Structure formats: C-alpha cells, structure tokens
Design a protein with these regions (language model features):
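ASCE RecA-like P-loop NTPase motor cores
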Residues: 1-236
Length: 236
C-alpha cells in the first residue's frame, strides 16, 4: 500500500509506521513453579528507521501520508517534548560544540567514536558525526569556536560529502525523550505508587512478590534518573 501511494503521490512524503518487533514475549509469572519470565523482544532496525522517518516527516512537513498499523494507537511519548528537545543546527546561529554534544545526549544519542551506527554520534576534534535513526546517511557538523562551519550528509563508509545544508534539525534517537522536569515528577509518582503497592503485597504475606516489585522498580527509577530511559518505559 505504501509503495502504491508513493506512485500516486510522488512529491509527497509517504511514510510507514508499523510495529517494529520481529519477536515479542511479554513478561509473565508462573505461580506453580514460582518462575518469573522477563519480557524479551527483538527489534527490526529497518522498521524502526521507518517509524522515525514517519515521526520526523510529520513534524517537519505538511504533505505527509502515513501508512500505519494498529500499533500507531500506542503511546510513544510527547510530540511536544520530541520536537522541543530537538536541536536545530543553523550556520547563522552560534553553537558551541560541547553544547551540541550535551543536546545529543539529552535526546538519547549514544557516543561511539569507533562504530557509527544509527542512534549514535562520534567526536573527532571539532567534527561531530551524527547518525540519526531516521536517516539513510550520517550528518557531519564542523565547528570553529561557536560557529558551525559545515553541515553535510556524508557516506558512512568513505566519509564523502553527499549533500550540504545551511540548517537542519536533529530529531531524537528515541520516541520516549522527555523534559527533565517531567522526568522528576514521574520519578516521584512512580516511587509513591510502588511504595503503596509493596505495602499491599506485604500485608497479604506476598513477600517475594513485594521484593521483586521493589527491586525492579528501583532499577527502572535509577535508569530513568541517570539515562532518561529504561526498558519497558511504555509501561510507566
């Protein structure tokens, strides 16, 4: 269907948004054997790229057609936070290299100076290469002091410049990016709810369940506080 629509609307952005799981096993508990089975999944990187392309197109263009499955009804974070946290790099606007790096970390890009994969960035002197999860090729940003001298799309293997830009937004590496005040409020709310539920479990002599819930929640809260993200964040 998406391919047909691209033929009918060659000048529009026709994008594809479906579930990115190749395999998904929800968490489960077998009381007979007291066995806890953690959630397990495998994500299709190509489909994940298409999902990010759909999001980026919706926020940057008006001529967008989205082909989606029912998975699009599930919440994936705030559009306002997703758009508001994305740095818009413009040659005419002063920007320090270190400030740009901090902005990338805030929107959940991982630094990897050896293997530039989607969702990562690398730093070599005044040059920052970013590989957005929605892009076919990485972006290169060259700085001189607080000036952005070059914004270009490059070949990930040869480093050859493919296209140059005057300005470009860098959209987040995850749909679940959230402003820090909201994260702090969520941490407080989750902690309070956990305490209440743990007390209920202990009151009914379900000590093992209470310990497991407390341990898992504490781990997730620590990840949210330090990284801004945790596995299973959609459950919160």
């Amino acid at each position: 269907l998406a391919s047909e629509l691209k033929e009918f609307f060659p000048n529009n952005s026709v994008v594809y948004f479906v579930s990115y799981y190749d395999y998904y096993q929800p968490e489960a508990y077998v009381p007979q054997s007291d066995t806890y089975i953690e959630k397990d999944s495998s994500i299709n990187e190509e489909v994940e790229m298409l999902r990010h392309q759909a999001t980026a197109s919706l926020l940057s263009r008006r001529d967008v057609i989205v082909v989606a499955s029912v998975s699009c009804i599930y919440g994936i974070g705030s559009p306002e936070d997703y758009a508001g946290l994305a740095p818009n790099v413009d040659k005419k606007v002063p920007l320090e290299r270190d400030d740009f790096i901090h902005a990338l970390i805030d929107i959940q890009y991982d630094r990897n100076d050896y293997d530039l994969a989607r969702g990562t960035f690398r730093v070599r002197g005044d040059v920052v290469d970013v590989y957005p999860p929605y892009a076919e090729h990485p972006l290169r940003f060259e700085f001189f002091g607080d000036e952005v001298e070059l914004i270009a799309e490059i070949d990930e293997v040869t480093g050859e410049m493919l296209r140059e830009y005057e300005a470009i937004p860098v959209w987040p590496a995850s749909h679940y990016v959230t402003e820090k005040p909201k994260v702090k409020a969520a941490l407080k709310s989750i902690s309070e709810e956990c305490e209440k539920r743990v007390a209920e479990l202990k009151a009914t002599d379900k000590l093992l369940e209470a310990q497991r819930l407390q341990q898992r929640t504490d781990y997730d809260l620590e990840m949210l506080e330090t990284m801004g993200f945790c596995n299973g964040i959609e459950n919160y």
